[in-house]
């Protein structure tokens, strides 16, 4: 197995880096977004939509931090997987925040991010299975 070639120290380091990156992403993004959109929470549905946005940040932030730490601490085919998913989740993260802020400032209330998050997770699984299919063939 590919994972057996990695030392235990590298595995622990990858987990620690992923946790630290995740905490950094959550603290920075949650804090900055909360300070920017405080005055736009006017409708009753906005409270629920802000929770959906935080769910988006937590899910995509976790997957992004996991793929970044895997990329920096692995070799060979696992590194190729991690590079692809780092780019994928990085673009997803930036587009999601841009979409959220743009719609918030344009519409003057908080948009729902549930559909975007579901769509991105669907594309993630689709790309994952395509990559796995290429490896097995």
From Swiss-Prot:
Signal peptide: none annotated. The keyword Cell cycle does not apply. Its main location: membrane. It is a multi-pass membrane protein. Keywords: Cell membrane, Membrane, Transmembrane, Transmembrane helix. One of its GO terms (cellular component) is plasma membrane. It is found in: Cell membrane. The chain crosses the membrane at residues 14-34, 48-68, 84-104, 109-129. The keyword Nuclease does not apply. This is Uncharacterized protein MJ0796.1. It comes from Methanocaldococcus jannaschii (strain ATCC 43067 / DSM 2661 / JAL-1 / JCM 10045 / NBRC 100440). The lineage of its organism: Archaea, Methanobacteriati, Methanobacteriota, Methanomada group, Methanococci.
């Amino acid at each position: 197995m590919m994972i057996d070639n990695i030392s235990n120290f590298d595995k622990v380091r990858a987990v620690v880096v992923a946790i630290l990156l995740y905490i950094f992403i959550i603290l920075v993004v949650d804090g900055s977004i909360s300070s920017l959109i405080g005055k736009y929470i006017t409708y009753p549905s906005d409270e629920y939509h802000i929770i959906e946005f935080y769910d988006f940040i937590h899910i995509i932030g976790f997957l992004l931090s996991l793929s970044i730490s895997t990329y920096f601490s692995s070799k060979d085919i696992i590194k190729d997987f991690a590079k692809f998913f780092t780019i994928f989740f990085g673009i997803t993260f930036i587009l999601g925040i841009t979409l959220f802020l743009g719609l918030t400032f344009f519409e003057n209330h908080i948009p729902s991010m549930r559909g975007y998050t579901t769509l991105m997770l669907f594309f993630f699984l689709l790309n994952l299975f395509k990559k796995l299919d290429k490896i097995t063939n």
